[in-house]
Amino acid sequence: MNKSELKPALVFEQFAKINEIPRPSKHEENMIEFLKSFGEAHQLETLVDETGNVLIRKAATPGYEHAETIILQSHMDMVCDKLVDVDFDFHKDAIQTYVDGEWLKAKGTTLGADDGIGCAIELAILASNDVEHGPIECVFTRDEETGLTGAHGMKAGFMTGKMLINLDSEDEGEIFVSCAGGQTTHATFHFSREEAPAGYFFMETSLKGLNGGHSGDDINKKRANAIKILARFLFLENEKLDGSLRLVSFNSGKMHNAIPRDGKIVFAVKNADKEQVRADWNIFASEVEDEFHVTEQAMLFNMSSTDAAPVIEKAVADKFVMALQAVDNGPLTTCQDEAIAWMVETSSNVASVMTDENSINIVASQRSNVMSNLENMTNTVKAAFLLAGAEVTVGDKYPAWKMRANSELTDLAVKAYEKLFGKKPLVKGIHAGLECGLFSERYPELDMVSFGPTLRNVHTPDEALLIPTVEMVWDHLLEILRSVAK
């Protein structure tokens, strides 16, 4: 299969156009202009709100003018991540895609199918002339990935439909009817630097090759967190060396909503201890590889000497390492309802650590389907860093989307799927944030579902789109549109 053979052709044509447009989160200006031009070129009513969300209206197919208006919604931004040895500028370069069997992938970068494929499906609906449907509103939101900015900023009345299909889910055959709420915690350790004592040897250790992944949807997959592993080594080694280890820097993770998959630390030890530290690192690496032998089979541990540099003041460095060792990470509780007892209810992810000249900045994200548990988890993370002397701020929370007791749209979506594929879809909740949570606050009567084609390894350069599922989602969506229209 080559790219010219991908089906539905109209969807993949639109996706190819989208991937020519730089659209990092918070920098969607080019995408907004593209959407405006698209709407105008097709003579469709096109609106842009003050936040930058775009809405394009398409009139009903003749004969279906009195049908219920249905909203199709996706987000226009993408997570920007690349392999360390790939030269790529997400602010100006086009995503380079290729076909690998049944999967569409990108060359060394994120693919942008989260949520570019959702946008492409909407544009294909707007451009098509042979789809039966009632009135449609296609909505494209800004900055979903780093703050849900578009959904936060959207005012009541911008959308007018009473049913909404969110096209930002990642497992074909699953229809999502609820999602987790979330919040982000930021901790900063301020410090001064000083010269290391005489007789110290400087070392750099790195960890890479982890799977990483989405910090909500993938948090229960037993994947390693690079930050927690590196912090664990520092804590253990400093204990062994009677507190003599001196830290220079700790850097790992780039995004608040991804499990960090690589990292690097620089530190100094006494000359007399350097060979023991090398031996300890090798033993530690073997132990961690054994712990994750099923889920992480490409871990790469490295240690080398490096140039001398000013070290972080001892008291701050030690408290920073202890805080990282102590802070909760991973899935913490599962749902209490027996029907969904397998699903993660509350989790936390230490997402990034960045060191500059006089501070270390940490980002951790918390999620829960129960808002009181979200508040408690956020306070637990906050307390760990406050006890260690950090300056802590907490970002705006976004709400959970609660399952609707009697959802006409869910019933229509299930029946349409059964009609097409002869089996029931899985109706479930997701332990990740969807914009549906915010929409449910502004539009409490809105009946919503979320589904999409199968994606794997989102938010990483291994992101992949399962090609056959795009056509399945397309057919499913068209059947729902026909059902609503009739």
Model features per residue range: what roles?
Residues 102-105, 145-146, 156-367:
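Midchain, well-structured core segments that form catalytic/ion-binding scaffolds
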Residues 76-78, 139-147, 169-172, 211, ...:
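Acidic, glycine-rich active-site loops and adjacent beta-strand->loop/helix elements
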Residues 2-102:
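Acidic/His- and Gly-rich active-site-bordering loop/insert found
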Residues 36, 157, 222-240, 272-274, ...:
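His/Asp/Glu-rich mid-to-C-terminal helical/loop segments that flank catalytic regions of hydrolases
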Residues 64-146, 151-162, 202, 317, ...:
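Active-site metal-coordination/substrate-binding segment of hydrolases
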Residues 343-432:
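Substrate-recognition/cap regions that form aromatic- and gly/pro-loop-enriched pockets
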